[in-house]
Design a protein with these regions (language model features):
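Acidic, Ser/Thr/Pro-enriched low-complexity segments and adjacent helix/loop capping patches
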Residues: 1-112
Length: 112
């Protein structure tokens, strides 16, 4: 399976959900403003993430700060180091919570 395209933030969560709930194995290559990153998925579990000199969940949450993300998913065996031990479901829920909190903050009125 080979997927590529350009996503906005919430669609990024949808893509991650699709890949994990479909039990895919492979590498999701991302590009944000010419900065490259990698999300390693094995049997539907997010094993590791690298972006902007960060590894693990810190890198994944940094990716979420960007509105536009170019991606390419290449299916295949992944035998790398696992740095993320939370279930993909838990990670997706954390991403959604973080997204909702940021949107609520952006929309909240300023009190003077």
């Amino acid at each position: 399976m080979f997927l590529e395209g350009r996503l906005e933030t919430l669609d990024f969560i949808t893509l991650i959900s699709f890949l994990t709930y479909s039990n895919k194995t492979g590498i999701l290559e991302i590009s944000i403003n010419h900065n490259e990153g990698l999300i390693f998925i094995c049997n539907g579990e997010i094993y590791n993430v690298y972006y902007n000199r960060k590894w693990g969940k810190d890198a994944l949450f940094e990716i979420m700060l960007y509105e536009y993300i170019d991606f390419c998913f290449i299916e295949g065996n992944y035998k790398g180091e696992r740095r993320i031990w939370d279930s993909s479901e838990k990670i997706i829920l954390e991403l959604l919570k973080d997204y909702d909190e940021r949107k609520a903050f952006e929309l909240s009125p300023i009190n003077i």
